[in-house]
Amino acid sequence: MPTINQLVRKERKKVIDKSKSPALKKCPQRRGVCTRVYTTTPKKPNSALRKVAKVRLTTGFEVISYIGGEGHNLQEHSIVLVRGGRVKDLPGVKYHIVRGALDTAGVNNRTVSRSKYGTKRPKAAKK
């Protein structure tokens, strides 16, 4: 605990919070162009082929973002919408691609958590 004299001499430092997604420049999402679409393997205890894309954003940053859901239609030069959110077992992946927005198709045959994967509500089955 500083004394009054110490506070007069040198004021308290302001705590600056660091953004977890600096490439978005304080926006909720940003548009970008895929420069490379590929698969990569996760960190040690996990094993899979995770689908990721390198995206050049409108802010000028080039980021690696994760493509969630089963199957995708992305390729080089696809226009995508990128949101924040890291993938714990993929180092360097701090962004997600929004499914069902711009060139990214929603996940087919998805019935639960549809809004997260850009899937429309299925037509009611006729009896």
UniProtKB/Swiss-Prot annotation:
InterPro entries: NA-bd_OB-fold, Ribosomal_uS12, Ribosomal_uS12_bac. PROSITE patterns: RIBOSOMAL_S12 (PS00055). The modification 3-methylthioaspartic acid is found at D89. SUPFAM superfamilies: Nucleic acid-binding proteins (SSF50249). One of its GO terms (molecular function) is rRNA binding. Coiled coil: none annotated. One of its GO terms (cellular component) is small ribosomal subunit. Belongs to the universal ribosomal protein uS12 family. This is Small ribosomal subunit protein uS12. It comes from Aliarcobacter butzleri (strain RM4018) (Arcobacter butzleri).
